[in-house]
Amino acid sequence: MREEIAAAVVFVTRLIKLNDSIPKEKVEEFSSELSSALVEKFKNHWYETEPTKGQGYRCIRINPSEPIDPAILKAANQCGLQYTDLNLPQELTLWVDPKEVCCRYVFVIIVYDIFFNNLFKVLPKHLLQI
């Protein structure tokens, strides 16, 4: 579970780093807080032998028509940041499942394993700069 959460946190953190107005130390603090929040959230909803079980619960959804994801909001608040400071995309879905982290960024679907083996082969060029 920790490896998958780490992959998700790295992805979200890279998106936040695009916002140069947040100091590096705050981004690192946010990353640590998000990791802790996700471990707490997922601990009773992680099924190694049934990875699709609990999939909806483990989904991190960013969309203007939906409430802010509680784990992201908690991590931001713990760091003294506002959610809007993160400058995350308006549309993002991140599924964190055993052995796989999958992201739909706007309308592009990106799938990568927890070791990022294939990440740089499938990312659009504009995301490689994150």
Where do the language-model regions lie?
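Small-side-chain structural scaffolding
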Residues: 8, 13, 75-76, 94, ...
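Extended intrinsically disordered, low-complexity regulatory segments in eukaryotic proteins
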Residues: 109-130
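Alpha-helical bundle protein-protein interaction modules that mediate dimerization/oligomerization
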Residues: 42-116
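Phospho-regulated, Ser/Thr/Pro-rich intrinsically disordered or coiled-coil terminal scaffolds
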Residues: 1-56
